[in-house]
Amino acid sequence: MTTDDRTRRRATAAEDSGHYKAEADMSFKDHFSRQAADYAKFRSGYPQEVFDYLASVAPSRQLAWDCATGNGQAAVELATVFDHVIASDASKKQISNAQPHERVEYRVAPAENSGIKSGTVDLIMVAQALHWFDLDRFYAEARRVLKPHGTLAASAYNLLRVEPAIDEIVNRYYHEVVGAFWPPERALVEKFEELPFPFPEIQTPSFEMIGQWNLEHLLGYLRSWSATQRFIAANKRDPLEAIADDLRAAWGDPGQMRKVVWPLILRVGINAMPKPPKE
């Protein structure tokens, strides 16, 4: 037996036991561990209607994979409509801040090498993270773990909307104050609908994330941005000082609760099986 044969047998045995060994991915770019606790505290969740819809288009409700789970918000919601959820993230600190749930199994693993058994997943969800991945490797991994006709769902959202005066200040902060500190991949969020997506896509309903925030919550959310943290690390000062006075004036009573909206972009594809060869 050759070395290659032994390697293949070990991999097959590991996979048959339900644990496909993931190799370390040294290329992971961790932009979130520094502010993991704030990320969990200030992020709004997706509406339940999103998860109900995704469950309705999956071939069954046995297993979902929340890929790049972050603080586990989506994983916990998926657990309301799936029997079991594997929630993975390449950041150990994000996983340490994730929300526990009896039907959610958290793992530290890169998106491109999940360690999930082949052909077992009904739904893969990637919430606000697809732009960070090595897409070719991730899509190969998605095809490996999905069941026939399993579903890949990727979502993204851009800047929040409150009201025009506040939106203008947030836009200025995003582009002018911390704009130079966004990782290059962030630009892909703004072109999310143009990202390669090599699965037959289906038309999806429109969804929005909605929150009710006071001014302190908005400032906390802006401070949790990776660009804000990178600015602070580079300049040893808080970039929010550049807009704080304008934001307070536009907001009014800082305790006033305002509706905050993010329109969601949702792309859903099916793991179509190849057609059998013609006889």
Summary of predicted features, one role per range:
Residues 6-10, 193-279:
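Conserved Class I S-adenosyl-L-methionine
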Residues 2-37:
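N-terminal, positively charged/glycine-rich alpha-helical extensions of SAM-dependent methyltransferases
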Residues 44-62:
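Conserved alpha-helix/loop element of class I SAM-dependent methyltransferases that forms part
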Residues 126-127, 135:
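A short beta-strand submotif of the Rossmann-like class I SAM-dependent methyltransferase core
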Residues 143, 147-213:
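Conserved catalytic/acceptor-binding region of the Class I
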Residues 65, 71-114:
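Class I SAM-dependent methyltransferase SAM/SAH-binding core
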Residues 112-123:
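A short acidic, Gly/Pro-enriched loop at the edge of an enzyme's catalytic core
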Residues 133-141:
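A short, conserved alpha-helix within the catalytic core of class I
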